[in-house]
Amino acid sequence: MVTDTTRRTLLKAALGCAAVPVLPFGCASRKDGASASNYPQLIGCALNGRGQYSAVVADEYGMPLSQLPIPDRGHGVAICPTSSHAAVFARRPGDYFMVFDYKSGEQIKLVVKGNNRHFYGHGVYSLDGKLLYATEGKTDSSQGVIGVYDVAQGYRKVEEFSGFGIGPHEVIIMPDGNLAIGVGGVHTDGRTPKNLDSMQPSLSYVSPEGVLLDQVELLDKKLSIRHLAHDGAETVLCGQQYRGEPDEYPSLLAMHTKGGQFESLNAEPEQWARFNHYIASIAASDDWIIATSPRGNCYGIWSKETKELVELSALSDASGAVLLDGEFRLSSGAGSVVSQRKPYEKSSQQSSVQWDNHWSAI
């Protein structure tokens, strides 16, 4: 339940939120003459120490341009395709999402969770930028909800979708405008799981009107589907958290194409063990799939054609992964930024940011 104290705390924190330039900040597009080094390309959440958190706008190499304080620890960021709005979502079970202008640094809106609701840390804009979809849950049951927020109405909640399962996490928009939802299947009290013996994870496809179009399940019900990406076409990549026996190491990645079945990506059990039962971020190019594990301090690259692991590399607190202009960018809680187009061809830079969880490409 949302209390007046919760609202006051979040609103008080929000009042102090103003973008702080880290480097000279160019708001013009590259076509207007701004150099790549000061043009916003990436946004992610960061830890600032002492219980302080921010959303950080960075250039194409992950070097910070500006940062915006946020009320509590953040998780995922949704980028509007038709404006310079970005929405940062609180880490689950989240109390808020905050919308800001990534060019000007202006805070647009702070949305606080509704009664018997919490946010799961992810959201996505519709292709026309008119709606924002957020993964939410009923706090007493973890029953999944997609909250629909109207941008033109100041991010007012105008609708809810449900009926696709318990514990949704990431939602992405497909090229046809439909939603793909990673449904973890886990009922939680706070962050404590309550139904591991009966969890029902799935990948669910939902229309913009809330109609359940398709739902596919992995054979192993202990694989909680968490994070998603798509390849620019109809293939969805799913990253899992394994909730089974601690000494078992199943595949944590799967692919699904409309009308087909899940296909697992392959690695040896000892290689999966490096990921410590958890995939954080996923990104895909035409040829490669990349996935990070902060718990395993590593990332892997798979061939999309063969579905075999072709590179496994160490990266301390490996977190965000995006595809930017045909090249992968990876972030790290230790501040490292890795640029990589294909296996074993990479460069690394050190940023001043303690990156936390995901990156989104503008």
Where are the regions that the model predicts?
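N-terminal export signals
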Residues: 1-5, 9-30
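Surface loop/turn motifs at the tips and blade-to-blade linkers of beta-strand repeat domains
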Residues: 67-71, 111-115, 160-164, 217-221, ...
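Blade-loop segments of beta-propeller domains
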Residues: 70-99, 105-125
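Repeated scaffold domains used in trafficking and secretory/extracellular systems
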Residues: 73-79, 118-124, 166-172, 223-228, ...
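Residue-level detector of Asp-centered blade-edge/turn motifs that repeat once per structural unit
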Residues: 81-82, 127-128, 174-176, 231-232, ...
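Asp-box/WD-like beta-propeller blade repeats and closely related beta-sheet repeat scaffolds
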Residues: 116-122, 135-174
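Short, conserved, GDST-rich strand-edge loop motifs in beta-rich repeat architectures
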Residues: 135-138, 181-199, 239-249
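Beta-propeller blade signature
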Residues: 146-150, 198-208, 251-258
